[in-house]
From Swiss-Prot:
Polar residues bias locations: 227-241, 420-439, 509-520
PANTHER family the UniProt entry points to: PH DOMAIN-CONTAINING PROTEIN, PLECKSTRIN HOMOLOGY DOMAIN-CONTAINING FAMILY O MEMBER 1
Function: Plays a role in the regulation of the actin cytoskeleton through its interactions with actin capping protein (CP).
UniProt-recorded name of the protein: Pleckstrin homology domain-containing family O member 1-A
Segments for region (Disordered): 1-23, 208-296, 313-439, 497-520
Pfam families linked: PH
Keyword NAD listed: no
Keywords: Cytoplasm, Membrane, Nucleus
Segments forming domain PH: 20-131
GO-annotated biological processes: regulation of myoblast fusion
Biased composition (Basic and acidic residues): 242-255, 333-347, 363-385, 396-418, 497-506
Length: 520
């Protein structure tokens, strides 16, 4: 039976390789299956290098090889055992598996050793030879002398270890002595580049700050720069300022270097160290100042707005203080005018005029509604709060040059309505409905008062001004209430800040305790 699957068939001289073989011995080789049983033939096998030689007879001086197998085409050698076989041959079989590369025609070899120990020995030797054959391509690589790497510093003279590096002054002297002077120019340019102006350094510092912390920029405003004015900040939003914005707006000027040497140090440091240090330096301070200034600015803005409204009302009535200068009011000595001038008024101490005797407002003094003026609710008009608000309003709205005529009819009428009418929002202490409307409406519904009120008389204009003044007082009351609300909000903010500080202190204390417990 001819074997057509052999790798090499021919006559080769076994003595040709001069080195000693790795292993030799007789092994039975599997040659196929017969009709009733497997066919095993004895062969003399020799392993030398990365080749496996198989002989039919024992090798002699002029022995010729029967088959030669190159172990490069094989993958590994392993034990071959059937699952349900109790034969002694089952314990000594091993195989040599070929590689699964395309075009590889080497056969799988199956051998039967004399004993299991001999089988293990052949498996180990064959696996070692296969590994050596795989690495043969790398071992055969030779490097020619011409292709060696050139070492430009191998033959260079070495500097002694104790020698110092040249200083800048020495380099400047050498550069000035040279003909071209390029070295001197380079050194001077390097020094000029190191000595940057503080403005340029601050611009770079701010640019890097914006790149590192883009979250600080919100709604088109740069939080790293302080706002231009408080009014501009309040026009943008009417709510309380944020915590991060407070910390960056109230922070002092950016840290500038102390001397010129720090510029060169900052420029020479590596970027990673600069970023790491700058992140730590740019953290906001833990002790954030309280936002009292912003709240006070908000309150003062509300008060300024109220003053502006009062000033606008005063400008709308430029002739309100000139009522005493009308010629038809100077020479008139009528009882009706004396009734309104104050001393003979029925709402003052007493009156002897016929109009005051017959006026329904005089009779109203004995009414039960007028007696309620002596009640404790009516006494609240004389409280310090009422007096202070009244004086503040008078100082803001009546101190103009047009309103300095204190004896005019207009001012007396306004004082009369303040004392008797109690329509001002500041006199909130009088909770009685009779207290608010009795005297003023009795006087307004009297026939004498109706005659004075009709037409375009100055008294009608004074009453119109009184209603506008009441509106101004209402605005002032709203400003005072908003100021109180701002104070309450400020107290809440302070309480929240104190709570956050206590939580931070407790966290740091717990962390320090854990570190102390871990350290021993």
């Amino acid at each position: 039976m001819k074997k057509s699957h052999l790798v090499k068939r021919g006559l080769q001289d076994a003595n040709q390789p001069s080195s000693q073989p790795d292993k030799v011995g007789w092994i039975r080789r599997f040659s196929g299956k017969g009709i009733f049983r497997e066919i095993w033939r004895n062969r003399f096998v020799m392993l030398k290098g990365d080749h496996l030689f198989i002989f039919e007879k024992e090798m002699k001086n002029n022995g010729k090889t029967h088959e030669v197998f190159d172990l490069v085409h094989y993958e590994r050698s392993e034990e071959l055992r059937k699952a349900k076989s109790h034969s002694k041959k089952n314990h000594s079989k091993f195989t040599l598996l070929r590689c699964q590369h395309p075009g590889n025609k080497s056969p799988n070899l199956v051998f039967l050793a004399v004993s299991p120990e001999e089988k293990e020995s052949w498996i180990n030797v064959l696996n070692t030879a296969i590994t050596r054959a795989k690495n043969r391509v790398l071992d055969e690589v030779t490097i020619e002398e011409e292709s060696l790497l050139a070492h430009p510093t191998r033959d260079r003279a070495k500097i002694p270890l104790g020698r110092r590096l040249p200083t800048r002054g020495h380099l400047m002297a050498v550069g000035s002595a040279s003909s071209d002077g390029m070295l001197t120019l380079d050194l001077v340019n390097e020094e000029d580049a190191a000595m940057l102006d503080e403005d340029e350094w601050l611009k770079d510092h701010r640019a890097s700050l914006d790149k590192l912390a883009p979250g600080r920029r919100r709604a088109g405003t740069d939080a790293s720069r302080p706002p231009a004015s408080n009014t501009e900040a309040q026009e943008k939003t009417s709510s309380l300022p944020r915590k991060s914005e407070i910390s960056w707006s109230q922070e002092d000027h950016p840290r500038t270097p102390q001397n010129k040497k720090k510029f060169a140090q900052v420029r020479n440091r590596c970027a990673s160290m600069d970023d790491a240090l700058s992140r730590g330096e740019r953290k906001p301070k833990k002790n954030i100042p309280s936002p009292t200034g912003h709240l006070q600015d908000l309150i003062t803005q509300r008060l300024q707005r109220t003053q502006e409204l009062l000033a606008q009302i005063q400008e709308q009535e430029p002739h309100r203080g000139r009522m005493g200068s009308y010629p038809y009011l100077r020479g008139i000595d009528s009882p009706r005018l004396r009734h309104l001038k104050g001393s003979d008024s029925p709402h003052s101490k007493g009156s002897s005029s016929p109009h005051s005797a017959n006026s329904p407002s005089v009779r109203a003094k004995d009414s039960p509604s007028s007696k309620s003026k002596e009640s404790p609710h009516a006494k609240s008009k004389d409280s310090p709060r009422f007096k202070s608000s009244k004086n503040a309003l008078r100082s803001k709205s009546i101190d103009s040059p047009d309103s300095k005529e204190s004896s005019s009819l207009h001012m007396k009428c306004i004082d009369l309505t303040h004392i008797k009418g109690s329509q001002s929002p500041l006199s909130t202490g009088s909770n009685s409905p009779h207290m608010k409307s009795t005297d003023f409406y009795q006087m307004s519904y009297s026939p004498n008062f109706r005659n004075m009120k009709g037409g375009d008389s100055p008294l009608g204009e004074a009453l119109d001004w009184d209603s506008r003044r009441a509106a101004a007082e209402r605005l002032l009351q709203e400003a005072i209430s908003s100021w109180r609300e701002a104070k309450e909000v400020l107290a809440e903010v302070k309480e929240l800040q104190a709570r956050q500080r206590r939580e931070e202190l407790s966290k740091t204390g717990m962390a320090s305790q854990k570190l102390q417990q871990k350290s021993p």
